[in-house]
Every structure is written in C-alpha cells, then in structure tokens.
C-alpha cells in the first residue's frame, strides 16, 4: 500500500505519517526545499520534492494507492496567501493525482470544522448543514472541499472535518498552556467547543481511507464531548497544576486584539482571522456519522489529553 502525505512535516501530518508506517503503509512525503523535517527525520519514508502551489513541481506524484492531503496554512499573513495555500493548492494536488495515479483507492482531504462554520443555534453541526464559514481560513478550506467534490465519479475521495485538534507538537493550543502557566488568561464569557486528541484523529483518517462506505463522503471528527471554555481552562490548569486568574475581556474588544496581534506578528496564532472565529461561542460538531458509518471510536477525553500534551511540552522545553 503506497501512500503519499502532503503536510507531513506539520503537527497532524507527522502523527499521520507515523501511524501509516505502523499500519504497514509504504509512505512518501511531499516536502518543499525549505521544509523543516525535524518530526519525520529517522522515519522510514521517501521524500518527494514539490510544492502544492506549483503545479509543475507535482509531476512526480505517480503510482500511489492513497493520497492524504494535509498541506495548507491555518494562519496566513493575508487572504491571498490563504487562498493559494488552501484552495489553489488543493486544486493543484487533485489535478496532479488524477493525471498519474490510475489505481488510486482513496484521496483523503483534511479540511476543518472552520469550513462548516460555527453552530448557528447551539446544536452540534452535522455534515449536511449549510456551510457558513466566518473566517478566511474557513472559506478557503471550503473552497478546497469544493475542488475535491468536483472530482466525484473521477476519483475516490473522502473529506474529513476535524474539530479543534491538540496533542504533542501542537503549536496552537500551546499559547493557552503558556497563559495558564503565566497565571493570567483572557476570558470573554462561556463558549463551547468540540475537541479531538491527535492520535484519535489520525486513526480516524486511516479508518476512513480503508472503508468503502467513506467514498464520496464528508465526516466530522471529534471526541463526542462538548467542552465549555471553563472545562478547557480547568483541564489545562489541572494538567499544569496552576490556577490562573481569568481576565474579563468584552467580545467587542476581540477585533482590537486581532489588529494588535497582526501588527506584532503576521500569521500569529491570535491573528485577526482566528479571532474572528473566536467571536462565535459554539464551535461544536456531531461525530455521529463517523461513529455509525466507520466505527470511529475516539478514546481520549480532554482532561487526559491535556495532561499528556503538557507532559510533552515540558519534556521538550516548550513550557
């Protein structure tokens, strides 16, 4: 079983690469010339040089049974950069795969709950709900989905919409761990989120690639629980054995924080696009379809996962 992973050097992609190897796949990783290979160094993988934004560099994508497309940007300096990375890049990789992979068994696109948007009524979002992304990131991930769906009948595919993903190597949730450790965390009222530990996600991704029932389908993936912002703070606090002060911040101040963060560092985890998402209080999804159709069975809940994540951060001097 020959598999190609794009985005293999990133947080989720590196975990997926390790899991594919453990499951007996022969893995190739599409990497750019300037990619940081620290998470896949020493793994028994082949490196294929290419860039999803450059169609000419993708001509060597040939003879794969499975393609897992994770490459993209969660935080971009501007809208055009996000479009090129998430939407145009997906179109390019889809076209490249179609040309030279006649025995392809599955193309798996890792999208995001951001493509569906927040829950409009407080109920967990299902896969058949009308998509209403509120951020540039969400809109470009939805654009990527549309390119994949446009290949129906020409290419077997599955689209995965993960909820908030966390675990070792995650740089996004790290900022909240650091805030808790510092002893002060901004709090703009109770919000609700779906989460999923990274090991459970990659197991679900591989499961979806192998199941015939997943062909042509979209699946939300979460651990099945709904966590309030208080639950999240409490889980991280317990993991770090800290008790931070919650600094009340009105939601009206969120855009101002985003502007300041954007000027301090482009692509920051707290940039204006990400804060646009945080203005909404229900980022929850139902994983019922994945559970019933695929037998998806996540094992790790937030309290346990936060402990494992904090241990990894400490061991690697991230905290």
Q: Which ranges hold each PLM region?
A:
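N-terminal Rossmann NAD(P)H-binding glycine-rich loop of SDR-like oxidoreductase domains
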Residues: 3-23
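NAD(P)H-binding glycine-rich loop region in Rossmannoid oxidoreductase-like domains
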Residues: 45-88, 92, 98, 116
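Short alpha-helix in the Rossmann-fold core of NAD(P)-dependent oxidoreductases
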Residues: 83-90, 97, 108-111, 140-141, ...
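Conserved Rossmann-fold NAD(P)-dependent oxidoreductase catalytic core, especially the SDR/UDP-sugar
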Residues: 92-136
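Active-site Tyr-X1-5-Lys
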Residues: 132-158
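Substrate-positioning beta->alpha
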Residues: 143, 171-175, 188-210, 216-220
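Flexible, glycine-rich beta-alpha linker
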Residues: 158-175
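Mid/C-terminal beta-alpha module of Rossmann-like enzyme folds, strongest
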Residues: 211-270, 293, 303, 307-310, ...
């Amino acid at each position: 079983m020959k598999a190609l992973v794009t985005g293999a050097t990133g947080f989720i992609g590196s975990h997926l690469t390790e899991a594919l190897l453990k499951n007996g796949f022969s893995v190739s990783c599409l990497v750019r010339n300037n990619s940081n290979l620290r998470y896949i160094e020493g793994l028994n993988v082949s490196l294929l040089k290419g860039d999803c934004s450059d169609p000419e560099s993708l001509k060597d994508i040939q003879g794969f049974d499975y393609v897992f497309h994770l490459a993209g940007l969660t935080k971009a300096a501007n809208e055009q950069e996000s479009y090129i990375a998430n939407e145009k890049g997906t179109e390019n990789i889809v076209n490249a795969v179609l040309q030279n992979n006649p025995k392809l068994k599955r193309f798996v696109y890792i999208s995001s709950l951001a493509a569906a948007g927040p829950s409009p009524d407080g109920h967990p979002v299902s896969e058949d709900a009308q998509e209403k992304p509120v951020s540039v990131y969400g809109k470009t991930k939805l654009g990527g989905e549309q390119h994949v769906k446009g290949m129906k009948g020409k290419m077997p595919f599955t689209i995965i919409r993960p909820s908030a993903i966390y675990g070792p190597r995650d740089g996004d949730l790290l900022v909240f761990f650091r805030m808790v450790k510092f002893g002060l965390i901004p709090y703009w009222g109770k919000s609700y989120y779906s989460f999923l530990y990274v090991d459970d996600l990659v197991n679900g991704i591989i499961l979806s690639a192998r199941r015939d029932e997943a062909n042509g389908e979209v699946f939300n993936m979460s651990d099945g629980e709904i966590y309030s912002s208080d639950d999240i703070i409490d889980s991280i606090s317990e993991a770090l054995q800290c008790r931070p002060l919650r600094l009340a911040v009105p939601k009206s101040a969120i855009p101002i924080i985003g502007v300041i963060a954007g000027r301090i560092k482009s692509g920051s985890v707290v940039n204006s696009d990400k804060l646009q998402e945080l203005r909404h209080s229900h980022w929850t999804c139902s994983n019922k379809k994945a559970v019933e159709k695929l037998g998806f069975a996540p094992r790790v809940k937030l309290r346990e996962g936060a402990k494992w994540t904090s241990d990894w951060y400490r061991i690697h001097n991230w905290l």
